[in-house]
Amino acid sequence: MAAETLLSSLLGLLLLGLLLPASLTGGVGSLNLEELSEMRYGIEILPLPVMGGQSQSSDVVIVSSKYKQRYECRLPAGAIHFQREREEETPAYQGPGIPELLSPMRDAPCLLKTKDWWTYEFCYGRHIQQYHMEDSEIKGEVLYLGYYQSAFDWDDETAKASKQHRLKRYHSQTYGNGSKCDLNGRPREAEVRFLCDEGAGISGDYIDRVDEPLSCSYVLTIRTPRLCPHPLLRPPPSAAPQAILCHPSLQPEEYMAYVQRQADSKQYGDKIIEELQDLGPQVWSETKSGVAPQKMAGASPTKDDSKDSDFWKMLNEPEDQAPGGEEVPAEEQDPSPEAADSASGAPNDFQNNVQVKVIRSPADLIRFIEELKGGTKKGKPNIGQEQPVDDAAEVPQREPEKERGDPERQREMEEEEDEDEDEDEDEDERQLLGEFEKELEGILLPSDRDRLRSEVKAGMERELENIIQETEKELDPDGLKKESERDRAMLALTSTLNKLIKRLEEKQSPELVKKHKKKRVVPKKPPPSPQPTEEDPEHRVRVRVTKLRLGGPNQDLTVLEMKRENPQLKQIEGLVKELLEREGLTAAGKIEIKIVRPWAEGTEEGARWLTDEDTRNLKEIFFNILVPGAEEAQKERQRQKELESNYRRVWGSPGGEGTGDLDEFDF
């Protein structure tokens, strides 16, 4: 094939380059088998051309492809200096010989390996047996593959000449005169090869494989850490392939035309960048001066500003109520510009700040919310005193009646109003959180949205704790109220907090968002989604993400499971499904991936489930679990694709460049 032919010619030129300087100086050249055994070469055809005939270096060779495209290939420096580096190795080995290193295996237990029907038993220095096992018992005849005869002698000068054992780095023993073979009538025989395995541990001898290259002639490969101290059997350090870099070689006029085209494209790109930079200050100046675009989705600027102000006001004042203790439904508000102006007349300064505030990141949005909360708290009294003031201002006709009535009548009226408020309490909470979710939907990424939810949740908890403390003071200023009344009030506030937190954690369904746009009223319960079935192809891949945190010596293990509505979980499921479909893989059963890292400071709710680095590496982790080494194979396929594309390219005059025939080309 074309690539093999090109690589073979390059290797031939490489050997010629190694031999030629020695022959010119009167030396004797030789083919270095050790170099071919221990060095690996890889060819890289680069897309960047060079001007031909400019390099006079001795390590550059000229080759031509099947499409008549010429290349200048530079040999790696490791190939030139390989022999000199080998001569500068460590001094001769002074430790025990190979037979002495293996002698402890004589007293060790025999090694066993089961392959298909047969079980093989190797006893060092004695024999090799083959038999069938059932229920830990030998069934049938026991065959002898051979008895110990001899071992390879590393001190024999004749044996050294073969170089076979040294190149492949193994020690061998010969076993013969075994049971008679039914196929050829000769006794069975076997060769046992011992290789170093540094990862096997102490006494980690094992039979790696059993082969039968010829009838009744066997080869057993045994890996052991006992041979690793010997330099002749220690595996060489793994090294990346030595790259042979090949650049397309162009004629001077072709190369100058290529350089001119590159310069023109660079000038065009620089011109576009300059135009964008010139437009940048104009855009930002319009934003800072408060100039809004004319097209605002069919709505007037006053109306949009009113909506923004209402939304932020709802976020910062969730306890504000309308006259009579009832909240004004969203659909009953006057949507006209005049009504919007009158409704937002008080916080005009706040509204102007919103117009000129530039939100560049989720962190800016969070800081902005905190500023709004702080400013609102400074400009109004505490929550415990706010409601009576509003009632006094909005319902002046009821105040005389309350003053004239007795305290019991007043308490009854307040209880009736509280009951009316409770009916719309859940609906108002869902409406508030729904508006908040809808505003953030187009601003934040899924990961940033989760972090913002957790921070808003923590802020709500702090606010409601203050409410509970103030309520306790109002209910029992002198310590005379009953304990049951105080507990009942705290229970009601805690229930409200739990509802808000639960709604904050849940993600609204698309049907719920459409309801918001039409009526701006959220139903009490979203319709339950149909349970996925195993036959549904969309739900054949299910991912569960669980976070475990080990506490102190007196604390239990904290277990948190990611909700199905979390967008990050949907992203992970899509990633796994795409990977399985593309590679044609099946994950039978369950696959468990553990990511261990130091626990970040903060609460469990505030900490992120997966970091950005974990999400990026999850694909590679999952790929390597299903198919060990498959990720490297995918990278190699991509490299091979680029290599073929560069090899097919035929350089020529401007506009005359083309590619080779895709059908006849094959790597």
UniProtKB/Swiss-Prot annotation:
Disulfide cross-links: 110-123, 181-216, 196-228
Region forming the signal peptide: 1-25
GO biological process, one term: retrograde protein transport, ER to cytosol
Residue ranges of the region described as Disordered: 284-355, 372-452, 464-483, 504-540, 633-667
InterPro entries for the chain: Man6P_isomerase_rcpt-bd_dom_sf, MRH_dom, OS-9-like, OS9-like_dom
Top-level division of the source organism's lineage: Eukaryota
Biased composition (Basic residues): 514-523
Residues that, per the record, bind a mannooligosaccharide derivative: 117-118, 130, 182, 188, 212, 218
Residues annotated as glycosylated: 177
Induction summary: Up-regulated in response to endoplasmic reticulum stress (at protein level).
PROSITE patterns in UniProt: MRH (PS51914)
Tissue-level expression: Ubiquitously expressed. Found as well in all tumor cell lines analyzed, amplified in sarcomas. Highly expressed in osteosarcoma SJSA-1 and rhabdomyosarcoma Rh30 cell lines.
Job of this protein: Lectin component of the HRD1 complex, which functions in endoplasmic reticulum (ER) quality control and ER-associated degradation (ERAD). Specifically recognizes and binds improperly folded glycoproteins as well as hyperglycosylated proteins, retain them in the ER, and transfers them to the ubiquitination machinery and promote their degradation. Possible targets include TRPV4 as well as hyperglycosylated HSP90B1.
Subunit structure, as described in the record: Component of the HRD1 complex, which comprises at least SYNV1/HRD1, DERL1/2, FAM8A1, HERPUD1/HERP, OS9, SEL1L and UBE2J1. FAM8A1 is stabilized by interaction with SYNV1, which prevents its proteasomal degradation. OS9 and UBE2J1 recruitment to the complex may be mediated by SEL1L. Through this complex, may interact with ERLEC1 and HSPA5. Interacts (via C-terminus) with CPNE6 (via second C2 domain); this interaction occurs in a calcium-dependent manner in vitro. Interacts with CREB3.
Record's protein name: Protein OS-9
Organism: Homo sapiens (Human)
Lineage, opening ranks: Eukaryota, Metazoa, Chordata, Craniata, Vertebrata
Gene label: OS9
